[in-house]
UniProtKB/Swiss-Prot annotation:
GO cellular component annotations of the record: cytoplasm
Protein's UniProt keywords contain rRNA-binding: no
Reactions that this protein is recorded to catalyse: tRNA(Asn) + L-asparagine + ATP = L-asparaginyl-tRNA(Asn) + AMP + diphosphate + H(+)
PANTHER family listed in its UniProt record: ASPARAGINE--TRNA LIGASE, MITOCHONDRIAL-RELATED, ASPARTYL/LYSYL-TRNA SYNTHETASE
Protein name according to UniProt: Asparagine--tRNA ligase
Main location: cytoplasm
Stored CDD domains: AsnRS_cyto_like_N (cd04323), AsxRS_core (cd00776)
Region forming the signal peptide: none
UniProt keywords, alphabetically: Aminoacyl-tRNA synthetase, ATP-binding, Cytoplasm, Ligase, Nucleotide-binding, Protein biosynthesis
Organism annotation: Leptospira interrogans serogroup Icterohaemorrhagiae serovar copenhageni (strain Fiocruz L1-130)
Subcellular location field: Cytoplasm
Length: 435
């Protein structure tokens, strides 16, 4: 006689009208003195388990009746179809074994404040909505890699510890690195990614990046995941086309693969998808200032376009908008100066609507050795720390462009979330390093 199969909630369709073993956690329980309905979580899905006193007997039934939330159990029973249950199946319990007790689980079904929930993040991840966000994140990661692999981009794993500043020296996490001075947690993989275009033309990286920004806004994390791409021989205009196609493609694929999860989050994706049906407008920084000034904003050339002003522009254009050619002083040393207006650089930020803000920053890179040395000096960065990077401009330098996208902001947009802290399993913010 064959053993009773151990089955996950993911594979129930193969075992209808059979005796099976299900291992999982008590998500909830309700019922009467004659029958109890147990919600059993396994593989991220909830299976309804019917426990009847007539079948189980008084002692086992009382054990079931007094189960606590998040108790881990092994249940044996007959699997039947039930269209009224959450996933179309129901398990009629024959026996149950408690694997691990759950005493006074802190996250009960009642309402809790966000500070409490973030402090209990290691447990909060078990909730239906947080699990749905994790699945959307997973689907986005898959869509990102699929997009690049289908277009002959090569994945390059760039270092987390570096001796070179990629963005702003004021937003670095630093640590002593043996006898070699300071090392920094990478703000970007871009500088290292650029080295690989000379080997494979089109490359990308996807991993954690770190910014020691003293910001407590709903759009900022000190640790976040960024996907970056670099393309040899690509112009600024070609870079914009790639970014738009990339964003539209990965959003559509993620939404398609996350239909049930978005339902759990009560997120209607229709307005989001509608934004993707038209071309993203491209406006110069100078034009953006003119529009903002016409709306009564007190802003002059050289000022930052803050988050509130970004949203004014997305409302003006009815969706995402590229803002290009920012003042050179406001942008990184590696961005190519605009030959038509040396006050600006050939860069662009993609601004998303609905309060999301900038989701992509990209530019054509400076390929000339003398020009980039001059930019390093302007930024008061130690030229000797970039000898390896400058070598790229000595040996077969070519025009090239690239971009970076912060995945947490994109996840927030897809899920309709107000804060990026729920878009990463364990958020790191100014005031939070635990759990």
């Amino acid at each position: 006689m064959s053993e009773t199969p151990i089955v996950s909630n993911h594979d129930l369709g193969k075992y209808v009208d059979q005796k099976v073993v299900i291992q999982g956690w008590v998500h909830g329980i309700r019922g009467s003195n004659a029958r109890q309905f147990l919600s059993l979580r396994n593989s991220g899905k909830i299976l309804q388990v019917l426990a009847e006193k007539e079948i189980l007997g008084e002692e086992v039934f009382q054990t079931v009746k007094h189960l606590r939330q998040e108790t881990s159990v092994t249940v044996i029973g007959n699997l039947v179809k039930n269209e009224k249950s959450p996933i179309g199946f129901e398990l009629v319990m024959e026996s149950i074994q408690i694997v691990g007790e759950s005493e006074n689980y802190p996250i009960t079904p009642k309402e809790h404040g966000i500070d409490f929930l973030i402090s209990q993040r290691h447990l909060w991840l078990r909730s239906s909505k947080q699990l749905a966000i994790l699945r959307v994140r997973d689907n986005l990661s898959f869509a990102i890699r699929k997009y690049f692999h289908e277009r002959d981009f090569l994945l390059i794993d760039t270092p987390i510890l570096t001796g070179s500043v990629g963005e702003s020296a004021g937003t670095l996490f630093s640590t002593e690195y043996f006898d070699l001075g300071n090392a920094y947690l990478a703000q970007t993989g871009q500088l290292y990614l650029e080295t690989a275009i000379f080997a494979h033309n089109k490359v990308f990286c996807y991993g954690p990046t770190f910014r020691a920004e003293k910001s407590k806004t709903r759009r900022h994390l000190t640790e976040f995941w960024m996907v970056e791409a670099e393309v040899a021989f690509a112009t600024h205009a070609e870079n914009l086309k790639l970014q738009e196609d990339f964003v539209k493609t990965v959003i559509k694929e993620t939404v398609q693969n996350s239909f049930q999860d978005l339902k759990v989050l009560e997120r209607d994706p229709a307005p989001l998808l509608a934004y993707l049906e038209k071309d993203f407008p491209v406006i110069d920084y100078t034009k953006a200032l003119e529009i903002l000034q016409s709306k009564g904003e007190d802003i002059v050339w050289g000022d930052d376009i803050n988050s509130e002003r970004e949203q004014i522009l997305t409302v003006e254009f009815g969706g995402p908008v590229f803002i290009q050619k920012y003042p050179r002083e406001a942008k990184a040393f590696y961005m190519k100066v605009n030959p038509e207006d040396p006050r600006t650089v050939l860069n662009a930020d993609l601004i998303a609507p609905d309060g999301v803000g900038e989701i992509i920053g990209g530019s054509e890179r400076e390929e000339n050795y003398e020009n980039i040395v001059q930019r390093l000096k302007e930024e008061k960065l130690p030229v000797e720390s970039y000898d390896w990077y400058l070598d790229l401009r000595k040996y077969g330098s070519v025009p090239h462009s690239g971009f970076g996208l912060g995945s947490e902001r994109l996840i927030a947009w897809i899920c309709g979330l107000a804060h990026v802290r729920e878009c990463i399993p364990f958020p790191r913010m100014m005031e939070r390093l635990y759990p």
